[in-house]
């Protein structure tokens, strides 16, 4: 790590933040292929972890044949996303969770290999409990990865979002294949690979990430340990320097500053499953608009549209507020359409929920700089989880008979 004080911070030639684990890292803002390759592997790992999490949820549904379990698991993800844990403690939790995920996978694999030597009832119980542990551990790991990627550059965050949705689509494929030896073996291998490395830390230890964090925080400290300084005046109008630790920034300030960007997707998260339930009661299983394929399609379209609109919303004044109003209006229209029995309201509402949630997460992260970035990314993470919770609850309405 090298810093030349006689040059302006941010110039390409003045700042070198080399990785401590990536070999042949140049630490240059002009490009570093070893770190690009390391970051790419980290994104693959983040996607595989999302695949493991999605697959564990669907496996519990397949084993229990009870949509109540599926709904409870989805809601538990939502609750966990609301809890803010310091980064240092989160790193310890993730280390333990990776071990739990690997151990639970190995136990389930051992019971599966034993096959006929174990009673079917006992096998079902053991495998279900193991997959439940994989779900609990995988949720914590995935939440941590979102925070890590969101505190890098914008490219890191967008790439992680694409990796997550790609992993979710791969995990959903468990519903499309028959559970035989080869698919089960591949699933076990993916779970073990996802448990072998902390891909969040691997991403953070690339020069691109470190340079991006320095550009935001003006600090060489690792995530969660940064402190900014600002001038403030006390009651006697005497200026003084105040320390602002990124872990101490309140989340509630963002709710006051950008309420529409945050609450619009949150309302959509709650309204969309209601729309799907209403249409389910009207049409039953004959509604062609309510299928797992449409859930995946809406997730994909929502992600793509949000990323295409990101720069417009960030660069043009009042566009974010207008976007929130458009999404809220769309949800209101979808609710009216659902009340009159129009099935197309189901995919439209989910697509707008996904688009609003991802766009809100991207916008909120971009607007928060310095020590405020970490707190903002906790809200961004919650918005992203809201998107997948809405999609999961919509899927639950499909399989409920």
Swiss-Prot record:
GO CC annotation: membrane; viral tegument
Mode of membrane association: Multi-pass membrane protein
Principal location class: membrane
Transmembrane segments: 43-63, 67-87, 93-113, 124-144, 159-179, 182-202, 259-279, 294-314, 332-352, 379-399
Pfam family, one: Herpes_UL43
Cellular location(s): Membrane
The entry's keywords: Membrane, Transmembrane, Transmembrane helix
InterPro entries associated with the record: Herpes_UL43
Protein's UniProt name: Membrane protein UL43 homolog
């Amino acid at each position: 790590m090298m810093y030349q004080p006689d040059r302006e911070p941010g110039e390409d030639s003045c700042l070198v933040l080399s990785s401590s684990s990536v070999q042949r890292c140049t630490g240059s803002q002009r490009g570093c292929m070893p770190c690009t390759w390391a970051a790419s592997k980290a994104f693959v790992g983040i996607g595989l972890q999302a695949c493991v999490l999605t697959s564990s949820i669907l496996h519990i549904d397949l084993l229990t044949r009870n949509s109540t379990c599926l709904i409870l698991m989805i809601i538990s993800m939502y609750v966990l996303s609301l809890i803010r844990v310091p980064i240092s403690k989160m790193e310890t939790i993730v280390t333990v969770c990776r071990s739990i995920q690997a151990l639970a996978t190995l136990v389930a694999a051992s019971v599966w290999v034993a096959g006929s030597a174990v009673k079917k009832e006992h096998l079902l119980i053991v495998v279900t409990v193991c997959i439940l542990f994989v779900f609990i551990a995988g949720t914590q790991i995935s939440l941590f990865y979102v925070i890590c990627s969101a505190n890098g550059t914008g490219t890191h965050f967008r790439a992680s979002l694409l990796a997550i949705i790609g992993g979710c689509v791969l995990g959903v494929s468990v519903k499309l294949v028959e559970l035989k030896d080869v698919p089960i073996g591949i699933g076990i291998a993916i779970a073990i690979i996802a448990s072998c490395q902390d891909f969040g830390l691997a991403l953070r230890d690339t020069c691109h990430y470190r340079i991006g964090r320095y550009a935001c925080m003006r600090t060489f400290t690792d995530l969660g340990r940064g402190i900014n300084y600002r001038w403030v005046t006390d009651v006697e109008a005497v200026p003084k320097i105040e320390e602002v630790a990124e872990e101490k920034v309140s989340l509630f300030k963002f709710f006051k500053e950008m309420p529409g960007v945050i609450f619009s997707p949150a309302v959509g998260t709650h309204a969309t499953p209601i729309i799907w339930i209403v249409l389910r009661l009207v049409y039953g299983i004959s509604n062609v608009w309510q299928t797992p394929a449409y859930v995946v399609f809406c997730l994909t379209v929502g992600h793509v549209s949000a990323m295409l609109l990101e720069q417009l919303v960030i660069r043009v004044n009042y566009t974010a507020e207008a976007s929130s109003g458009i999404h809220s209006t769309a949800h209101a229209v979808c609710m009216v359409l659902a009340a009159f029995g129009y099935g197309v309201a189901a995919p439209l509402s989910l697509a707008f929920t996904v688009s609003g949630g991802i766009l809100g997460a991207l916008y909120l992260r971009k607007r928060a700089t310095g020590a405020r970035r970490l707190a903002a990314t906790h809200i961004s993470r919650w918005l992203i989880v809201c998107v997948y919770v809405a999609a999961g609850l919509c899927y639950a309405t499909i399989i409920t008979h």
